[in-house]
Amino acid sequence: MASPGAGRAPPELPERNCGYREVEYWDQRYQGAADSAPYDWFGDFSSFRALLEPELRPEDRILVLGCGNSALSYELFLGGFPNVTSVDYSSVVVAAMQARHAHVPQLRWETMDVRKLDFPSASFDVVLEKGTLDALLAGERDPWTVSSEGVHTVDQVLSEVGFQKGTRQLLGSRTQLELVLAGASLLLAALLLGCLVALGVQYHRDPSHSTCLTEACIRVAGKILESLDRGVSPCEDFYQFSCGGWIRRNPLPDGRSRWNTFNSLWDQNQAILKHLLENTTFNSSSEAEQKTQRFYLSCLQVERIEELGAQPLRDLIEKIGGWNITGPWDQDNFMEVLKAVAGTYRATPFFTVYISADSKSSNSNVIQVDQSGLFLPSRDYYLNRTANEKVLTAYLDYMEELGMLLGGRPTSTREQMQQVLELEIQLANITVPQDQRRDEEKIYHKMSISELQALAPSMDWLEFLSFLLSPLELSDSEPVVVYGMDYLQQVSELINRTEPSILNNYLIWNLVQKTTSSLDRRFESAQEKLLETLYGTKKSCVPRWQTCISNTDDALGFALGSLFVKATFDRQSKEIAEGMISEIRTAFEEALGQLVWMDEKTRQAAKEKADAIYDMIGFPDFILEPKELDDVYDGYEISEDSFFQNMLNLYNFSAKVMADQLRKPPSRDQWSMTPQTVNAYYLPTKNEIVFPAGILQAPFYARNHPKALNFGGIGVVMGHELTHAFDDQGREYDKEGNLRPWWQNESLAAFRNHTACMEEQYNQYQVNGERLNGRQTLGENIADNGGLKAAYNAYKAWLRKHGEEQQLPAVGLTNHQLFFVGFAQVWCSVRTPESSHEGLVTDPHSPARFRVLGTLSNSRDFLRHFGCPVGSPMNPGQLCEVW
């Protein structure tokens, strides 16, 4: 429901606004409210939705104070927050709202004085106030001279809803959020802040004072303080010291297996995107942006999706040739089914095929083939059957349930799915572990299609690749890069000795996995049960709109990025980020010059490579050019009433886009991440580092934060990505992005000695009694350590040039210490034991705790600034250093 036009005054203003304190005034004002349009003080929900939603969770119990006849409570319900209780002083308006929203019994309405709330303790997670406290202050002479009675009244209400003086900021922590919007509370906060800012100006005028009292400094100091655990010595456990408070205040949200800064920022970005896509005045000249909204809205059509049920996938399976689990199937069509499943619909049974830059000739693209075909996150889940019995049973239950939902026979579905699972176990047996695939020189094999045919003769490769890359014409001499020759040879033998019915069941199972997320709630519910076992998620509370934002990001991510960038990105941030990268690059090269183990020839080549690293900040330029953006998605058709068909169209469109790349050179405009992504990456074949707009925000970066925090946040991320150019894999590529040996033998041997130290260091860390894999995480650990060192050296260089910064109030840290705390708090995280195990066996990164502890225990600068003695847990005595 819309509110009256902006700036329109309510029709019945009292002669004196102290009438706002009288219930009789409100009772009279709201006569007939059930039939009149709603009125929203300070604007309707849409005016602050993007700011509010990142602070809310769908399961929150929300209390709205002084609801009046506002549409806020109902719009919260429509926005995916169903647990809303609204109270008002006036019984007349409460009765009116109960009548107006009788069709929504979930909404609760109570007659109650906000000064005498009658709810049990801890009844609510969120309290919203928009204008009510202003009414309590009616009759004051002016907003700047509030009487002691007025202050007492506001204090009384804040106490009623749970604010505890001295223990939290006015806008609360997210553990039990009390969120007050507008009203006198914000006015009082603004007045207090104004006093602090004024005091800060005086401090700035007097150079003897070194405390920063700007609004930004006060806010960030509060966030840092509430994340710290002062009961722990920084030299005992710096992660707990930096994140203990954050962990206490951030219990794992329902439906999540992990929660950290990256998740929080992505939720925030999603809320902004939701606001943009659901804007009723959405009007874009870009066809790609219009497609984005149509795709998103089709995903939200839950009633239509439920109405269609499983039929869209059943029809697709029948079109391909049938499935032995659900009915008749064509027994002689292995190649045809493989082409449809892996080509048209982009699933990856047995292996994956893609087009990418040739590692040894990076200015050209080439067909690449690699191992694939497992549904569970890692081969370990299949092979360590005793430890993973619960997961394998849950997976088989999931397979059976989906087979039954699609028409499988009760008497045979589980037996046939067991055969598919056994085939996946055989695939896991021949799959090469990730920690044995880190030397790209060894796993890179370039050959012709005819040579590939001889290596893996169980299928017609020319026929398959020609179909996949249609309408391109291929011949037997077409080059292909194969990663893992032994795997392909063995998978070919496995195909030859497997019964056709099992092959068919496995191929269609891959298609089912790919498409069921587009089907009705029964399929989602089946998956939730598997995910609970696999990742420890207790229940799924992810609202549909968030799922749809993620789907839209996958399908039309750069068109979505265009909307995001235009709405949020500060162009000056790009210039500042580029300056920081330059400073960090300089610091890295200076450290390079001091390495005693590297010979001069290799050092010079390394410096040239560092100089040549190309940085991309924010977004690719083409997304702000409507015609160029439209061209990217030209040919992708969007149906307004079939989300399933939109996903099928996406797979088909993606296959055509891939084929189009083969005869073109790689382009720098082809980013691997969309602008709204909260992440960054280094691409060795382009020798480039990329920082999307999504990560260029607090706590990683903010223009008005101390430089210590910016260098400790986004600065370390920048140093991390730059160091990837010189980790155990990146160091194999030269400055042009080509995989070739450019190191002298002596320096290479020394490099391996230094990395062996780091590998062994991380091998010693444990999570829930399970050791980290120092080999699997080596590249990321090298980047973490090198990135921290480069960023800190860049910060010191900045200080030499600009002088010391003012310190944050109350935190009790020097700015050098603040740098390390800022770095650590970026990695504050909570995670289920099941998710922690999954990370240990699949993730090339170390767990968050050891990204902090491992890196800082190797940092002489950290140990010096915190005074950690040799023998303390943070200073074991031996430091592992590569860069």
Curated annotation (Swiss-Prot):
Annotated spans, Methyltransferase-like region: 1-160
Binding site for S-adenosyl-L-methionine: W26, Y30, W41, G66, D88, Y89, D113, V114, K130
Binding site for Zn(2+): H720, H724, E780
Cofactor: binding details: Binds 1 zinc ion per subunit.
One GO biological process term: methylation
Listed CDD domains: AdoMet_MTases (cd02440), M13 (cd08662)
Subcellular location: Golgi apparatus membrane; Cytoplasmic vesicle, Secretory vesicle membrane
Phosphotyrosine, modified sites: Y39
Transmembrane spans: 179-199
Known cofactor(s): Zn(2+)
Cytoplasmic side: 1-178
E.C. designation(s): 3.4.24.71, 2.1.1.-
Catalytic activity of the protein: Hydrolysis of the 21-Trp-|-Val-22 bond in big endothelin to form endothelin 1
UniProtKB keywords: Cytoplasmic vesicle, Disulfide bond, Glycoprotein, Golgi apparatus, Hydrolase, Membrane, Metal-binding, Metalloprotease, Methyltransferase, Multifunctional enzyme, Phosphoprotein, Protease, Transferase, Transmembrane, Transmembrane helix, Zinc
Membrane association type: Single-pass membrane protein
Residue pairs linked by disulfide bridges in the UniProt entry: C212-C217, C235-C868, C243-C828, C299-C548, C757-C880
UniProt signal peptide: none
Annotated ranges, domain Peptidase M13: 211-883
Gene Ontology MF term list: metal ion binding; metalloendopeptidase activity; methyltransferase activity
Residues with glycosylation annotation: N279, N283, N324, N384, N429, N496, N652, N745, N753
Gene Ontology cellular-component terms listed: Golgi membrane; plasma membrane; transport vesicle membrane
Means of activity regulation: Inhibited by phosphoramidon.
Positions of the catalytic residues: E721, D784
Annotated family: In the N-terminal section; belongs to the methyltransferase superfamily. In the C-terminal section; belongs to the peptidase M13 family.
Protein task: Converts big endothelin-1 to endothelin-1. May also have methyltransferase activity. May play a role in amyloid-beta processing.
Name recorded for this polypeptide: EEF1AKMT4-ECE2 readthrough transcript protein
